[in-house]
Amino acid sequence: MVKIIAIDGPASVGKSTLAKKISKKFKAPVLYSGKLYRMLALEVIKRKINLNKTEEILRCIAYIDLDNLSSAELYSSEVDNISSIISAKKQVRNKLIAFQRSFPKKYGNNIKYVIIEGRDIGTVIFPKANYKIFLWAASEVRAKRRYNQLRKNGKNVSYSKIFSEINVRDRKDMTRKIAPLMPAANSVLLDTSYIDIEQVFNALKNIILKTKTV
């Protein structure tokens, strides 16, 4: 039976980078759930949808392109803010939750692991995941990472603005009524503030190799 590896954590903590490395090591497909919300947010922005019109937002789900996961547009501050707002809408979450839960089923028993990365994977989407990892890092560290990422993509951005936006995003994610950001009770917490991605990768790799299930 396919084992679920759930990787949760706040914005710019390194979830996607870690998921890619684990995917390569264990030949496991990855679903970046946060990018689903980002792609939906991008469609909402492009189509100038009123954020109070939930039905119109839901119709935008049909336009999500899973082949466009690496688009630089997904990492703009506007997309970041809009994705946080729409992810708090119950109807939107229910639609995308169903999509996420169906993802491992498409592989049957042909693979050993599936990686799902997001903010509520271990608490809501897959509460019985075999491995639950919660990544954390200080907000100033995450702001610097986001700043460097955007600069690499040719964006002219302000570190102080990004730092402020990350703190606002954290407050929204942690205090929202629906699926607030928090570690699952039985998750492994890894603070990435002062360790590099290789150290985080090795820690998770060892957990997977040495632990039967969580």
Predicted regions and their residues:
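ATP-binding Walker
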Residues: 10-13
